[in-house]
Amino acid sequence: MLEQMGIAAKQASYKLAQLSSREKNRVLEKIADELEAQSESILNANAQDVADARANGLSEAMLDRLALTPARLKGIADDVRQVCNLADPVGQVIDGGVLDSGLRLERRRVPLGVIGVIYEARPNVTVDVASLCLKTGNAVILRGGKETCRTNAATVAVIQDALKSCGLPAGAVQAIDNPDRALVSEMLRMDKYIDMLIPRGGAGLHKLCREQSTIPVITGGIGVCHIYVDESAEIAEALKVIVNAKTQRPSTCNTVETLLVNKNIADSFLPALSKQMAESSVTLHADVAALAQLQAGPAKVVAVKAEEYDDEFLSLDLNVKIVSDLDDAIAHIREHGTQHSDAILTRDMRNAQRFVNEVDSSAVYVNASTRFTDGGQFGLGAEVAVSTQKLHARGPMGLEALTTYKWIGIGDYTIRA
């Protein structure tokens, strides 16, 4: 089965690579329109997936990731339209010039070819990834989680209908609908057809891909994100940022998981934090230094376990640790962070600059929420992933991250001396 999918994707990629920006945008507009026109079939499939997931004991955080609503589906369609409005990087000349030999040389952006994406219970990923791949002239093979099998099948069927109505092969966007995990291992060895692989899931999936894939892998998406509250932070303003970073949508990878509080502000900050977190129904996992003071407040508090500093909760849980100073905070982030998104809240711009320079994450913020690490927020349109590695792409992966380049030399029967 996968062999045939690979052949179809590779053949489709050749055709996609030749499309003009106008032709690609016409396809995307058709997909957006069809997602809305056929929303009932997608929402019905999603309702079945959610019901099965709830019956199987999936957590509320995971159910939130899985669930589609009419408003969310409308937002997904609008994201596709936003991709239409983005500049097409394919064909851009990055640099070039004329050599001493007279050869005119240029470096031009081109599609990667075929992208493989493995992801879990996030039905929006199906459309986000497909739209970005099509905009950049790439074919894509999707392997979603078993929890979203009906939703993904219904969504891909809509996309393929739109492709065919525009005269393009259905092989441009395909999904592996068989939940057999052995197919993941088989997919990881499809280097004959797939040019880049992007896993979007937990640490286990990333480890599997790194160890078994014969395809170049872009890893990321695991977000143990931190906010450091410096001693000069404005408490009321800091709490607004923390509430946003923790509660706006707890199941996302850019949600804060650990709060580091400077010891010199702890006495005034912790009572205010407890009150605010109680109102937001957040459970605090406190270290020894913060435990007694937080237990005196209204928030639910438990003693933090050492391993929880490495956990991506994806829920209304927040670690709280007292640190001696900025050095202590940076050391903690280096040990426990995942190089995703980290922030400092401070009025001391020297400390802010040190934090920016010394915290080696894909996104670093000063006096802002970690929730901004998102392709849409960055103006990139829908994102294919958030890369936490350093090669090829880093941070939210938009259109340019799905391209490579080729060197083009134009001469007049020019030969090398």
Swiss-Prot record:
Q: Which reaction does it catalyse?
A: L-glutamate 5-semialdehyde + phosphate + NADP(+) = L-glutamyl 5-phosphate + NADPH + H(+)
Extract the CDD domains matched here. Answer: ALDH_F18-19_ProA-GPR
Compartments it resides in: Cytoplasm
Q: Which PROSITE patterns match?
A: PROA
Q: Name one GO cellular component term.
A: cytoplasm
Similarity section: Belongs to the gamma-glutamyl phosphate reductase family.
Q: Which PANTHER family match?
A: DELTA-1-PYRROLINE-5-CARBOXYLATE SYNTHASE (PTHR11063:SF8), GLUTAMATE SEMIALDEHYDE DEHYDROGENASE (PTHR11063)
- List the protein's name: Gamma-glutamyl phosphate reductase
